[in-house]
């Protein structure tokens, strides 16, 4: 079994290609004033705004702290997601999507990369042509997300031959039509898509599946400032080590990355290798 610290050292020497949509996340921090007398809405007072590089750019920010060489294929389309956020408790009130045109992504040359990492946010980047090209990758990891812009129409089942798949619980349930049953029931069907499967469970940690075996790992923190990007951090780090890692090490390192990101508002900063090692030592 390769130690967790050695896994991070292995990742540092890899050449990775990160593919996915480029998203700009904008937070407008507001102070709620109350309900106007004539309208069924809530009035707010704008305090300030903050802009972050999200989507594949945020994932790359985490990966660059660990991996020696990281390239990006983002298709050229910029998506803006503006959120109005109650400033005192960082509670999001509503969100607006803005897509500035659409460019069909070019299929990247995947030769020469140790790992190809796909962040599929369901906004059109992962075309069938792109998916058909993935078997040419030496090792392919994918995170297939469900959000308000694609609910029910961006399922992991559109992929067929991944090495590593990482989704959250709602995404796993949608992909396997498992509304009320145990989440464990979703793992074998997802195991037909990828050799290694991880389902993140929020405050309940994460569960992994490989070769018919199920592994669970509890979450590492109860402190959550902002959940945005925690799953991306989990995936960005674990995608770099999934090939060599045993399942428990994969889950522990992912949970450490997610715990660190959950304490950061938006994408203000990436998680560092030093922070990741310190978190793993703290929970050992």
Regions flagged by a language model, labelled:
Residues 237-238:
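Flexible, glycine-rich loop/tail regions that form catalytic "lids" or insertion modules at the edges
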Residues 1-40, 44-227, 242-256, 263-284:
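Ribokinase/PfkB-type carbohydrate-kinase core domain
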Residues 231:
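Short basic (Lys/Arg) and small-residue
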């Amino acid at each position: 079994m390769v130690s967790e610290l050695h896994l991070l050292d292995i990742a540092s020497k890899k050449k990775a290609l990160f593919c996915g949509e480029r998203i700009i996340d904008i937070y407008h921090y507001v102070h709620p004033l109350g309900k106007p007398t004539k309208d069924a809405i809530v009035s707010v007072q704008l305090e300030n705004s903050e802009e972050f590089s999200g989507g594949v750019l945020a994932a790359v920010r985490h990966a660059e702290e660990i991996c020696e060489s990281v390239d990006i294929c983002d298709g050229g389309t910029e998506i803006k997601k503006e959120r109005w956020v109650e400033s005192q408790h960082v509670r999001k009130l509503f969100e607006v999507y803005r897509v500035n045109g659409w460019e069909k992504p070019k299929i990247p040359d995947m030769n020469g990369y140790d790992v190809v990492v796909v962040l599929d946010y369901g906004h059109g980047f992962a075309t069938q042509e792109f998916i058909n090209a993935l078997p040419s990758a030496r090792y392919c990891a994918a995170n297939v997300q469900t959000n308000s812009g694609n609910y029910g129409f961006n399922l992991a089942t559109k992929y067929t031959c991944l090495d590593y798949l990482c989704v959250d619980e709602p995404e796993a349930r949608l992909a396997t039509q498992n509304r009320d049953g145990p989440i464990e029931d979703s793992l074998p069907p997802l195991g037909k898509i990828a050799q290694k499967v991880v389902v993140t469970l929020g405050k309940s940690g994460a569960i992994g599946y490989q070769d018919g075996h199920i592994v669970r790992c509890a979450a590492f923190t109860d402190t959550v400032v902002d959940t945005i990007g925690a799953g991306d951090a989990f995936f960005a780090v674990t995608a770099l080590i999934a090939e060599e890692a045993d399942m428990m090490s994969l889950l522990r390192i992912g949970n450490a990355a997610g715990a660190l990101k959950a304490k950061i508002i938006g994408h203000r900063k990436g998680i560092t290798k030093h922070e990741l090692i310190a978190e793993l030592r703290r929970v050992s």
